[in-house]
Swiss-Prot record:
Applied biotechnology uses: Possible candidate for an effective malaria vaccine as determined by epitope response in sera.
Record's protein name: Uncharacterized J domain-containing protein PF3D7_1401100
Keyword vocabulary terms for this entry: Membrane, Merozoite, Transmembrane, Transmembrane helix
Transmembrane domains' residue ranges: 30-46
InterPro entries for this protein: DnaJ_domain (IPR001623), DnaJ_X (IPR026894), EMIR (IPR052423), J_dom_sf (IPR036869)
Subcellular location per the Swiss-Prot or TrEMBL entry: Membrane
Residues covered by the J domain: 144-210
UniProt GO cellular component terms: membrane
SMART domains registered for this protein in UniProt: DnaJ
UniProt keyword ATP-binding, yes or no: no
Membrane topology (UniProt): Single-pass membrane protein
Pfam families hit by this protein: DnaJ, DnaJ-X
Keyword field contains Cytoplasm: no
Length: 492
């Protein structure tokens, strides 16, 4: 017989629990650290490698030529950069001019939380119109996490994902008329239930110990988890698992205790590198398959690709991700076509220069966002030994490797337990600002990661030694078309 306690026993009743922000349930510093470490982990992984200029990369020797005026006017990889003179530069919707990212341009100072509410509401309405959203919240007595997600103990991961997605869209939090924002009980509980039941170790603990066993599990803020981690998986066939999502997945899968975050960060680098290698191999093979599909029927191929792209728009950040992937595909395809189709012409490496410019801009954005993350952590998390149990425990363990001072260790645990339950008193406006900054930073880090990964995979596809030059040429042309279709969709 299961020892699982009901949610109601732990004061988590859907019907009776008073609505309040998730921050009042879990310390702000705890939530911040859970998410921030993911971004810092990705930044550390990125910095372990050299930032090579694209000028050093060639696809079997890159030949170049000058673009004709006509080609300049019609080629989006060229016109969407600041290398082209444009009197209406401020009207360029793609915003790749100077150091401004596409995401910043589209938002144009708009509240990112408001933007996400609008996008998720639209996706939910589209799903209802298309008769996709069938999942209903359990209207009976909600006794446990399984009831919250309307599943049972034997439901597979796909059912968990589907129900979590549909129910989260149904209960996505709204901004009130006075511009205040508060996460609702249903949305909170859906996220917490999913973050426990979708990871086997956590699920086993819950099945054996009930909600009590989840008390000290790290739970990422529901809004950040849904928009920044979960929904990116809807585009998995094109972008794989992002580095941020992979880190969070490792962290939750292994049910790492908060006091072990620092050591886990160091240990996870190797796993993240292996995961990234697998991601690139998988995406390279998937891209080959997509480009080779109906190789002799371009019209049928384009219709299938358009249908796939339409499905990709079901993610709240899809506009930004489609632009990142589309621009990269189009640019890499152009680099290859210029080297092979026009090898006898003089060319100044325009597409390579465009890529260099874009990559340098991405690195600048990445550095800026990592610095912003550090600033947030300093503000909301105590990085001093006197109040930080992680640093204190690490120092204690280091100084006492030769002997077991159990009483002292127990006292450290008591201090940690007290700090675990401590809340930082910050205003609702500060809560809102914190969420805004975290969402913006995670979005930008994800986009930098996606572009770098997709570029590597696209190169691999066009350097595939198992096929001949005619296949390479066909793939490059289709890659260019695929990129253009994605860019069109991102602009709708």
């Amino acid at each position: 017989m299961s020892n699982r306690q009901s949610i109601d026993d732990m004061n988590l009743s859907v019907k009776n629990k008073k609505s309040k922000s998730i921050f009042s349930c879990r310390p702000v510093k705890y939530v911040c650290l859970s998410v921030a470490v993911a971004a810092v982990g990705y930044a550390n992984y990125m910095n372990n490698g050299d930032r090579n200029s694209l000028s050093c990369v060639d696809l079997n020797n890159v030949y170049s030529r000058n673009l004709s005026e006509s080609q300049e006017n019609h080629n989006s990889s060229f016109t969407r950069t600041n290398l082209v003179e444009n009197e209406n530069e401020e009207d360029d919707i793609f915003g790749v001019h100077r150091d401004e990212s596409f995401a910043e341009t589209v938002l144009n100072g708009q509240d990112i939380i408001s933007y996400l509410e609008h996008q998720n509401t639209k996706i939910h309405e589209d799903n209802i119109h298309d008769d996709i959203s069938h999942t209903l919240l359990n209207e009976g007595d909600v006794q446990n996490y399984y009831d919250v997600l309307n599943v049972n103990e034997h439901s597979d991961l796909n059912e968990l994902k589907r129900n979590f997605h549909n129910l989260s869209l149904q209960h996505y939090p709204k901004i009130t008329s006075d511009n205040s924002f508060e996460l609702n009980d249903e949305f909170n509980q859906l996220s917490e239930a999913y973050q426990v039941l979708s990871y086997q170790i956590r699920k086993n603990i819950y099945d054996n110990e009930g909600v009590y066993g989840t008390k000290k599990m790290a739970i990422v803020n529901p809004l950040i988890y849904f928009n920044g981690i979960f929904t990116t998986q809807l585009m998995h066939e094109y972008i794989g698992t992002t580095e941020v999502a992979q880190f969070v997945q490792l962290f939750l899968e292994r049910n790492i205790a908060p006091e072990n975050i620092v050591s886990f960060l160091e240990e996870s680098v190797s796993d993240m590198m292996k995961g990234q290698d697998y991601r690139e191999l998988q995406l390279t093979e998937l891209l080959k398959q997509k480009l080779d599909l109906y190789i002799n029927d371009d019209e049928k191929w384009q219709n299938i690709i358009k249908s796939e792209i339409n499905v990709l728009t079901k993610s709240p950040f899809s506009k930004f991700i489609l632009e990142a992937v589309g621009w990269t595909y189009e640019n890499v395809g152009n680099i290859y076509m210029e080297q092979t189709d026009n090898f006898d012409n003089v060319y100044h490496g325009i597409y390579v220069n465009l890529a260099d410019e874009r990559i340098n801009r991405n690195y600048a954005i990445l550095d800026e966002n990592v610095n912003d993350f550090v600033s947030l952590l300093k503000k909301f998390y105590p990085f001093t030994e006197t109040v930080n149990p992680y640093l204190r425990r690490a120092k204690h363990n280091l100084n006492n490797l030769q002997g077991g001072i159990n009483n002292l260790y127990s006292s450290v645990n008591v201090v940690y337990d007290n700090l675990f339950n401590e809340n930082i008193n910050i205003s609702s406006n500060e809560h809102y600002h914190l969420l805004q900054e975290l969402l913006k930073i995670i979005l930008n880090i994800n986009l930098c990661d996606i572009e770098e990964t997709i570029r590597e995979c696209a190169y691999n596809v066009l350097k595939d030694k198992t096929v001949d030059a005619s296949v390479h040429s066909k793939r490059a042309h289709r890659m260019n078309i695929l990129g253009s279709l994605m860019l069109e969709s991102s602009n709708e």
